[in-house]
C-alpha cells in the first residue's frame, strides 16, 4: 500500500488576512500548473483562516487548510485560545501539534499535546504530531530515546482507528540554515516507523505518513523525496513566497 504524501507550509506568525489573499491569488494557479500527487496545504495565522478559506473556495483549489495549534477543550475560560469547533467553521483539514516552538517557547508538555492529538482526531481534523531532537540531545547520542518518548506520549490519546501524520523536525535544523542530510533523515524516519509499529502494529505503521521539516528549500526537496520513509515535507520560511513554495512542491515530485 502506497502511503499518501503531504507538503505543508507553516507560515508561523506571518501574513495578515490581506497578505494571505494576495499570496493565494498567485499560489493557487501555480499549484494547478504543478498538479502534484501530494496533498499540499498551508497553516496561516488564526486571523487569516477565514480569508484563506474563502480564497481556496474561490479558486476551486485542492489546497488544504491547516491550523498551527488548537486547545484540547471545545470551549471554556481559556483566554486567547482557539477551539476545534472554531477551526471547523473554516473547513480546516489538519492541525500542527507539538511544534518545537510550542514545546520550547511556550513550554507545552507531551501530556497536553497528547490531549490535543486525541481531541483533533475525534473532531475529524487530522493531527500532525511534530517531534524532533535538540542539538544538545543529538550531541549526547540520545536522539532515538527522545523521538521514541515523544511518539509514545504524544500518541497516547489517539483513537485506535484515527488518522495521524507525523512530522520529524530536528530542532537544530529549524530556521537555522543547517540541513540534516538525506541519510540522517531516512534513518530517523525509519526509526520512527519502528516505534510506530511497536505502538500500533506493523501494518498501521506502514500506513502513517512521516514528513520531514527543517530548513527545507526548493534545492533540497528532491533529495528528501528519494528517501523511502519520507512521505512529504513541512516547510517553514520557503513557504512564505508563493513561487518558491510552488518550486518546492514541483521539485519534490521530480
From Swiss-Prot:
The active site is at residues 99, 169. This is Triosephosphate isomerase. Substrate binds at residues 10-12, 175, 215, 236-237. Pfam families: TIM. Keywords: Cytoplasm, Gluconeogenesis, Glycolysis, Isomerase. Involved in the gluconeogenesis. Catalyzes stereospecifically the conversion of dihydroxyacetone phosphate (DHAP) to D-glyceraldehyde-3-phosphate (G3P). It catalyses: D-glyceraldehyde 3-phosphate = dihydroxyacetone phosphate. Its EC number is 5.3.1.1. It is found in: Cytoplasm. Belongs to the triosephosphate isomerase family. It comes from Chlamydia abortus (strain DSM 27085 / S26/3) (Chlamydophila abortus). The gene is tpiA. Homodimer. GO terms for molecular function: triose-phosphate isomerase activity. GO terms for cellular component: cytosol. Pathway: Carbohydrate biosynthesis; gluconeogenesis; Carbohydrate degradation; glycolysis; D-glyceraldehyde 3-phosphate from glycerone phosphate: step 1/1. GO terms for biological process: gluconeogenesis; glyceraldehyde-3-phosphate biosynthetic process; glycerol catabolic process; glycolytic process.
